[in-house]
C-alpha cells in the first residue's frame, strides 16, 4: 500500500495521542473467522471455511487482534492495515519474533487502499468506524464492497445511540475541561479531564436530588474514571468520536448496496433466512436444524441461572456449566431428559422443556451469552507422555513475554485476551516442547524454580514442583496450547 504523505491534521493529532499515551492492542473473540463463519451459517449463508480464510483488518494498530488469530489458524492468512508507521513496525517485530508467516501489517491510509490487495473472505473494522471522518467512512464501505468475497462477511463495530448519549456527556466534559489547554500534553489532558470529572461527580453526589436525576451520567462517569489513561485519551479526547443510531448505520450500508443487519454482498443476500430472529419460529424444524449444527460455549456463570424460568432448563445449564460450558444440542437434550426423568415429571412436560431449551439457547446466541461455532477451536486434554506444546504457541508466548506485552495482549483459542502471560508459562511451554514423562518435567521444574531455595526441604520442593506441573497443565489446556502426538492434531 502506498504511503500517504498528506495526512490530515486530525490524523496527526490521533497519532500524537497514540505516541504520548501508548495503546495496548486487544484481541476480540467475535471477530474470528470461526465465529463469523458460524454467524453467516446462522442466517443461511454459505460462508467461506474459517480454517483457510483470507482475513483483512482495517485499523489494525499493533495487530493484537489478528496476530493471535494467526497463531491458532495456521492455514488462514491475515493482513492488517494501519496508519501509524510506529505501530506497524512494532507489530511486525512481534510477528517476526513469533516466527509467524501467515500474518502481516502494512502501513497506509485507507483512502489510498490499493486494488491489488485482492479479495478477502472476512473483513474486520473493530473500533474504527466511529473514529474516522465521513470521507473515510465512505471509503471503508467502498473497500468492503470491492474487496469482500462473494459469500464473505464484514465485521464493523461502532458506537451507538441512545446508549452513547450519556457517554457523550462525559466526553464533552473531558473536552470542556481541556478547552484552551493546547500547551498540555495528551497525558496531562487526560489527568486534567479525570480530575475535573471526579470533582463534578463528587459535587453531584452531595445532593440527593441531583444524584437521582443524574444516575446514568454518574454511572458512565464512574466507568470512565476507572479506565486506563490510554483508553480515556482515545475515546474521549480524540478529534473524531462519532456515534450514530443503528438505523443511520443501516442507511449508510444501504447506500453502498449492502444488506441491512449483516454486511454481506447483495448477491449473497438472497440466501439469508431471518427466521432465527423470530421468537415464534425458534422451535420450527428449520431453525432447530440450524441450531443443532453448532457447538456452543457458555459465557455466563451459575449465578445467572435464575433467569431461566423452566426448572429443567435451569438444571440443564447448571450441569453444562459444571462440565466446562462447551456443548452441542444432543448433549444438552440428553441432560435435560435425564433431569426430567430424575424429577419424575410427566411426559407432557418434556416437550415444553425442550422448546424452552431451544428458545434459551437462541436468545443467548443473539444476546452474546453463548458463543457458537461451526468450526470449534481445538482444545485437547493434557495426556502424560503424549501431549506437548507446539513451537508455534511457545514462540508466540515468548514474543509477548519478551517485550510484546507492552503493545498487545496474548490470547487463547477463542481470541479472549490473556492478561497474565508470564515467564513461568514460557518456561513450562519450553519444557514441554515434546511429549515427556511427568517425572521428567517435574524434575526440570524443580531445578529451574525451586532448587536454589535452600530453606525448603527436598520433599517440599518436590511438592511445589508437582503443584506447579498440575496447575500449568490445566492452564495450557484452558488456553488451547496443548496438542497430542496420538491425535495427530499437531500445529
Language-model segment annotations:
Residues 62-75:
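Conserved SAM-binding loop of SAM-dependent methyltransferases across substrates and taxa
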Residues 138-150:
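A short glycine-rich, Lys/Arg-flanked "PGG" loop and its adjoining helix->strand segment in the class I
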Residues 114-123:
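A short acidic, Gly/Pro-enriched loop at the edge of an enzyme's catalytic core
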Residues 20, 24-52:
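Conserved alpha-helix/loop element of class I SAM-dependent methyltransferases that forms part
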Residues 259-264, 299-491:
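Long, charge-rich, low-complexity alpha-helical segments
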Residues 158-183, 203:
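Conserved class I S-adenosyl-L-methionine
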Residues 151-159:
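Conserved beta-strand signature within the Rossmann-like core of class I S-adenosyl-L-methionine
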Residues 223-325, 333, 339-350:
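C-terminal lobe and adjacent flexible extensions of AdoMet/dcAdoMet transferase-like proteins
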Amino acid at each position: 500500500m502506498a504511503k500517504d504523505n498528506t495526512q490530515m491534521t486530525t490524523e496527526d493529532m490521533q497519532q500524537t495521542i497514540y505516541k504520548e499515551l501508548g495503546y495496548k492492542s486487544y484481541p476480540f473473540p467475535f471477530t474470528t473467522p470461526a465465529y463469523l463463519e458460524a454467524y453467516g451459517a446462522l442466517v443461511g449463508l454459505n460462508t467461506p471455511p474459517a480454517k483457510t480464510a483470507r482475513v483483512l483488518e482495517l485499523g489494525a494498530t499493533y495487530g493484537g487482534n489478528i496476530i493471535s488469530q494467526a497463531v491458532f489458524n495456521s492455514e488462514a492468512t491475515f493482513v492488517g492495515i494501519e496508519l501509524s508507521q510506529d505501530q506497524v513496525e512494532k507489530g511486525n517485530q512481534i510477528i517476526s519474533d513469533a516466527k509467524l508467516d501467515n500474518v502481516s501489517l502494512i502501513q497506509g491510509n485507507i483512502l489510498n487502499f490499493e486494488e491489488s490487495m485482492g479479495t478477502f473472505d472476512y473483513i474486520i473494522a473493530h473500533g474504527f468506524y466511529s473514529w474516522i471522518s465521513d470521507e473515510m467512512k465512505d471509503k471503508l464501505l467502498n473497500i468492503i464492497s470491492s474487496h469482500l468475497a462473494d459469500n464473505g462477511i464484514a465485521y464493523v463495530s461502532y458506537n451507538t445511540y441512545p446508549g452513547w448519549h450519556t457517554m457523550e456527556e462525559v466526553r464533552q466534559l473531558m473536552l470542556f475541561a481541556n478547552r484552551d489547554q493546547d500547551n498540555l500534553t495528551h497525558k496531562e489532558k487526560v489527568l486534567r479531564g479525570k480530575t475535573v470529572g471526579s470533582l463534578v461527580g463528587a459535587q453531584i453526589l452531595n445532593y440527593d436530588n441531583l444524584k437521582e436525576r443524574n444516575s446514568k451520567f454518574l454511572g458512565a462517569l464512574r466507568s470512565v474514571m476507572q479506565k486506563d489513561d490510554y483508553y480515556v485519551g482515545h475515546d474521549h479526547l480524540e478529534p473524531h468520536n462519532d456515534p450514530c443510531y443503528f438505523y443511520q448505520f443501516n442507511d449508510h450500508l444501504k447506500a453502498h448496496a449492502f444488506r441491512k443487519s449483516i454486511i454481506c454482498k447483495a448477491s449473497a443476500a438472497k440466501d439469508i433466512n431471518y427466521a432465527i430472529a423470530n421468537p415464534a419460529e425458534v422451535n420450527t424444524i428449520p431453525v432447530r436444524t440450524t441450531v443443532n449444527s453448532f457447538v456452543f460455549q457458555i459465557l455466563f456463570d451459575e449465578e445467572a441461572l435464575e433467569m431461566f424460568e423452566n426448572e429443567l432448563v435451569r438444571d440443564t445449564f447448571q450441569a453444562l456449566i459444571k462440565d466446562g460450558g462447551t456443548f452441542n444440542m444432543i448433549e444438552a437434550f440428553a441432560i435435560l431428559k435425564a433431569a426430567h426423568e430424575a424429577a419424575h415429571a410427566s411426559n407432557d412436560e418434556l416437550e415444553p422443556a425442550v422448546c424452552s431449551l431451544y428458545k434459551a439457547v437462541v436468545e443467548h446466541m443473539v444476546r452474546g451469552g453463548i458463543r457458537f461455532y461451526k468450526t470449534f477451536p481445538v482444545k485437547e486434554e493434557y495426556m502424560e507422555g503424549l501431549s506437548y506444546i507446539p513451537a508455534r504457541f511457545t514462540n508466540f508466548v515468548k514474543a509477548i513475554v519478551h517485550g510484546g506485552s507492552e503493545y498487545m495482549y496474548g490470547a487463547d483459542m477463542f481470541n479472549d485476551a490473556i492478561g497474565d502471560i508470564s515467564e513461568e508459562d514460557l518456561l513450562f511451554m519450553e519444557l514441554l516442547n515434546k511429549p515427556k514423562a511427568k517425572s521428567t518435567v517435574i524434575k526440570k521444574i524443580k531445578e529451574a524454580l525451586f532448587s536454589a531455595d535452600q530453606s525448603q526441604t527436598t520433599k517440599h520442593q518436590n511438592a511445589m514442583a508437582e503443584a506447579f506441573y498440575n496447575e500449568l497443565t490445566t492452564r495450557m489446556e484452558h488456553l488451547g496450547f496443548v496438542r497430542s502426538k496420538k491425535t495427530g492434531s499437531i500445529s
